[in-house]
Curated annotation (Swiss-Prot):
Subunit (UniProt): F-type ATPases have 2 components, CF(1) - the catalytic core - and CF(0) - the membrane proton channel. CF(1) has five subunits: alpha(3), beta(3), gamma(1), delta(1), epsilon(1). CF(0) has three main subunits: a, b and c.
Name this polypeptide is given: ATP synthase epsilon chain, chloroplastic
Presence of keyword Thylakoid: yes
Entries under InterPro entries matching the protein: ATP_synth_F1_dsu/esu, ATP_synth_F1_dsu/esu_N, ATPsynth_dsu/esu_N
Amino acid sequence: MTLDVSIIIPERVFWEKRVEEIILPTLSGQMGVLKDHIPILTGLDIGIILVRQKSSSDWTSLVVTGGFALINSNNVTILVNEAEFGSEINVEQAQISYNSSKHALEMNKDIKRKFELTLNLKKARARFQVTQLKK
């Protein structure tokens, strides 16, 4: 038996697959989900979703920017603001974005902008980290 996973962004259903295992970036840390998981609704942080598809040892990685996951009856429904496949992210651009986001936060003197810059850094970090998983 497997899990039916749907990742939904505001514009459309981004990705639907039958998978063996999924690891989610929840607000309280990473959470692995296998078949027959207890029902749960959890908040998702900016981070990396890892998915192992049926009959495979390979993992698919996606970067998501916050949202929710509902796990019920071997269905995983993920609602996020943005999603992007790790395999489609340019390594050099991700590193440049990460470094510039980090620098912008370090140089920030405006308390009001700190929250926005912190979110930008988390997203840039996740995009850069997912490129390192491809190696």
